[in-house]
Design a protein with these regions (language model features):
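Short beta->alpha connector loops
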Residues: 1, 23-24, 67, 90-94, ...
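Acidic (Asp/Glu)-rich catalytic clusters
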Residues: 5-14, 36-44, 75-80, 99-105, ...
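Conserved, mostly hydrophobic/aromatic
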Residues: 9, 18, 41, 89, ...
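Histidine/lysine/aspartate-rich catalytic loop segments that bind and position anionic ligands
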Residues: 42-44, 53-58, 62-64, 70-72, ...
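Alpha-helical scaffolding within the catalytic cores
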Residues: 2-6, 70-73, 94-97, 120-123
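Active-site gating/metal-coordination segments in enzymes
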Residues: 1-56, 61-62, 182
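Mid-to-C-terminal alpha-helical segments outside catalytic/metal-binding sites
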Residues: 8, 132-137, 145-184
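Active-site-adjacent C-terminal substructures of enzyme catalytic domains
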Residues: 78, 84, 91-148, 156-162
């Protein structure tokens, strides 16, 4: 049913990507039970975002295991080289591991959401401002981070103009195959 709903969401509702929250299922991203969904994402030519890193506490009554180490994307990226994988939440506390996966695999990207930009790990700021500027996408995980606050903090950062444009807009346009708006 899930694969049918994914196809329907893309073909009939205009969805441009998929989202997976591995912690809810207690299954790491490289669990083979996800592979039919990955194959469908490839067929539909859409990226899939998934939380990597530790699980945040959204509810004290339901604590979930942290099953999304960024290294688990390694096997998926190898098995599905055409699948565009976006590891969201920066991979914290394994940010270096997340950067390593994005650097190693052409099809792995990083979403810098769920953490206020002023609290981004220094290595992710360096990566997105230099050799990884084509691999990082901005996000807020609203309502976790207020978009206005996040933009103000990004504007306060010492980012190169080209890197900032890619972070905030260009990388998402390319990855999600979105049209450029007129006058942009």
């Amino acid at each position: 049913a899930g694969i049918y709903q994914l196809r329907q969401a893309v073909e009939e509702m205009g969805f441009v990507g998929a989202h997976l929250y591995p912690h809810w299922f207690g299954l790491a991203p490289n669990d083979r039970r996800y592979y039919p969904y990955y194959a469908k994402c490839c067929e539909l030519d859409i990226p899939i975002m998934m939380q990597v890193g530790h699980n945040l506490i959204y509810s004290r009554e339901r604590r979930l295991p942290s099953v999304g180490r960024p290294i688990t994307l390694d096997e998926v990226a190898i098995d599905f080289p055409e699948l565009k994988l976006i590891g969201i939440h920066i991979g914290v506390p394994w940010t270096d591991e997340m950067i390593s996966m994005a650097w190693k695999h052409e099809n792995v990207f990083i979403g810098v959401d769920a953490y206020a930009p002023k609290h981004w790990p220094p290595q992710i700021v360096h990566y997105l401002n230099t050799y990884g500027q084509d691999k990082v996408l901005f996000g807020t995980d609203w309502p976790v981070i207020d978009p206005e606050r996040a933009m103000a903090e990004v504007n306060d950062m010492d980012l190169r103009a080209e890197a900032k444009a890619k972070l905030l807009r260009d990388n998402a346009l390319k990855l999600f195959r979105l049209p450029e708006s007129p006058g942009a």
